[in-house]
Curated annotation (Swiss-Prot):
The gene is NAPRT2. Gene3D superfamilies: Aldolase class I, nicotinate phosphoribosyltransferase. It comes from the Eukaryota. NCBIfam families: NAPRTase_put. Its cofactor is Mg(2+); Mn(2+). Keywords: Glycosyltransferase, Ligase, Magnesium, Manganese, Metal-binding, Phosphoprotein, Pyridine nucleotide biosynthesis, Transferase. This is Nicotinate phosphoribosyltransferase 2. GO terms for biological process: NAD biosynthetic process. 5-phospho-alpha-D-ribose 1-diphosphate binds at T391.
Length: 557
């Protein structure tokens, strides 16, 4: 694609392609191409259409969702182009299609498409359009499946991450450890990115760290510990001090000396007797490799009788040479109990052996954690500083999909509606504007949709907000602040300014700030208060006029 199409003539930065090279125009459902052909055959392919991308219900039994995936959608738009090879394949899939349709596909791009969206990382709610896509119906129809694919999982896993952050609390570190359990390579990469967006602090996924600049965290597994048989396997025993001024020629012996001191300590001697020496060898070896970031997995054999004492011996030896060990990881057992016992042990070492700060060692917990287990740990009382969460986080174990939809709401300036016996599936017609209204305490009160040409809500002026389908649900609101939600992120080749795609860190900061600004009763895990989504009185009347106009009238005989 030429730079003037991808970046505009305003000198805006050229937009790279999607992170995953599999995201091409062929990442589509077949019926998008059959409809494109039918539109083209009927001469309707250039008719101006408006589609809304939205969801109908918040995930995980909650009352909020985090919007994610917008950046990847814009990258897809900016680089939308079918190759000759792809066009040949589409032709094979549509037997009997005319050759001229291939010429049409060959000329397709998104230079006549406009996309308005809520900023990525925003807290969003059902029915309100996350994205409004305008353009020739033949092109926009080919954006539906890719956009839904890019937004559905991204928003789901970002919301899952935000919920884990909420239950863990602001003070805890959250580490995403899900690569090995994710649904394939893209599931792993996407989950790492959007878990970070949703409030996690770091990932173990090296590829995601490289691609997105996410902080990396990780130490060692049980395999490393059990691979050692004794300290005799440690060949290089030399440790240079942190300041570089001294050298310990036999760090192994220094560790063993500290272990004996711990064993003979009056307050600690009753907890353990002999520790596992192969584990001690593994810890010592790892500390020699990473003296500045030593953190040990202590549950390979026995946490309190071996893992913790062995860790302390190595950490105390490192301390003598100017290094501060980071802490431990617990991957099994009663995490609440073991974390408390470990903390007590560390505090006793600090007190008995006069080592300032030793009691503040970081305790990391893993082992199939999820919202429920973290909530249970909180209720039991624990001393965990960081949670490593994998399977339940990245797979969104408690809900498989978000359920975003992409619905036509206007074509050739004519509003359209999708009806259903299930009222939750009735679409809200016409090209709309969306606003968030804030109350006196600074919290959002309601999101309201209006017709495109309606005057916007004004601060201090009373406004009637109506439920889109339930006539008895209505309320007056006097907003103290009004925020328009949809902003332009793509104007095709038009020489007009558009929103700049912010870096991931800024999107993450936005997400955290928005979540903090929500009313607490909307955020709680159990029985959260639903957030109000409404339409203006004028739009309400129009929805029901169009509904009656389009619904067939039955006849009784």
């Amino acid at each position: 694609m030429e730079p003037k199409e991808n970046g505009s003539e305003l000198g805006q930065k050229i937009i790279d392609g999607p992170t995953n090279p599999m995201v091409t125009p062929l990442l589509n459902d077949l019926y998008q191409f059959t409809m494109a052909y039918a539109y083209w055959k009927a001469g309707k392919h250039n008719e101006r259409s408006v589609f809304d991308l939205y969801f109908r219900k918040n995930p995980f039994g909650g009352e909020y969702t985090v919007f994610a995936g917008l950046e990847e959608c814009v990258k897809f738009l900016a680089n939308f182009k079918l190759t000759d090879e792809e066009i040949d394949f589409v032709q094979e899939c549509l037997p009997g299609s005319e050759e001229a349709f291939c010429d049409y596909l060959r000329g397709l791009d998104c230079s006549d498409v406009e996309v308005y969206a809520i900023p990525e990382g925003s807290v969003v709610f059902p029915k309100v359009p996350l994205m409004r896509v305008e353009g020739p119906v033949g092109v926009v129809q080919l954006l539906e499946t890719p956009f839904l694919n890019l937004v559905n999982f991204a928003s789901l896993v970002a919301t899952n991450a935000a919920r884990h952050r909420f239950v863990a609390g602001k003070s805890k570190s959250l580490l995403e450890f899900g690569a090995r359990r994710a649904q394939g390579p893209d599931g792993a990469i996407s989950a790492s990115k959007y878990c970070y967006l949703g409030g996690f602090d770091a990932t173990s996924n090296v590829a995601a760290g490289k691609l997105f600049g996410i902080p990396l965290r990780g130490t060692h597994s049980h395999a490393y510990v059990s691979s050692f048989m004794s300290t005799d396997e440690i060949v290089d025993k030399v440790l240079r001090s942190a300041d570089g001024k001294t050298t310990c020629e036999d760090f192994v012996s220094h560790v063993q000396t500290w272990l004996k001191k711990i064993q003979y300590s009056p307050s600690l001697s009753g907890i353990f007797s002999e520790t596992n020496q192969s584990e001690l060898a593994a810890f010592t070896s790892y500390a020699l490799a990473f003296p500045k970031t030593f953190l040990a997995l202590v549950d390979t054999y026995d946490v309190m009788k071996s893992g913790i004492p062995n860790f302390c011996a190595v950490a105390l030896a490192l301390n003598d040479f100017g290094y501060k060990a980071l802490g431990i990881r617990l991957d099994s057992g009663d995490l609440a109990y073991l974390s408390r016992e470990a903390r007590n042990f560390f505090c006793t070492v600090e007190r008995e052996l006069k080592v300032p700060g030793f009691g503040k060692m970081v305790v990391t917990a893993s082992n199939d954690l999820n919202e429920e287990t973290i909530d249970a740990l909180n209720k039991q009382g624990h001393e965990v500083d960081a949670f490593g969460i994998g399977t339940y986080l990245v797979t969104c174990y408690s809900q498989a999909a978000l359920g975003c939809v992409f619905k036509l709401v206007e074509i050739n300036n004519q509003p359209r509606i999708k009806l259903s016996e299930d009222v939750t599936k009735v679409s809200i017609p016409c090209k709309k504007r969306s606003y968030r209204l804030y109350g006196k305490e600074g919290y959002p009160l309601v999101d309201i949709m209006t017709g495109e040409n309606e005057p916007p809500p004004k601060v201090g002026e009373r406004l009637l907000c109506r439920h889109p389908f339930n006539e008895s649900k209505r309320a007056y609101v006097v907003p103290q602040r009004v925020e328009e939600l949809l902003k332009c992120y793509w104007r095709g080749s038009a020489d007009e300014a558009r929103e700049v795609l912010p870096p991931l860190k800024e999107i993450r900061d936005r997400c955290i700030k928005q979540l903090e600004n929500m009313r607490p009763d909307h955020m709680r895990r159990l029985n959260p208060t639903p957030y109000k989504v409404s339409v203006s009185a004028k739009l309400y009347d129009f929805i029901h006029f169009l509904w009656l106009n389009e619904a067939p009238v039955g006849e009784l005989q």
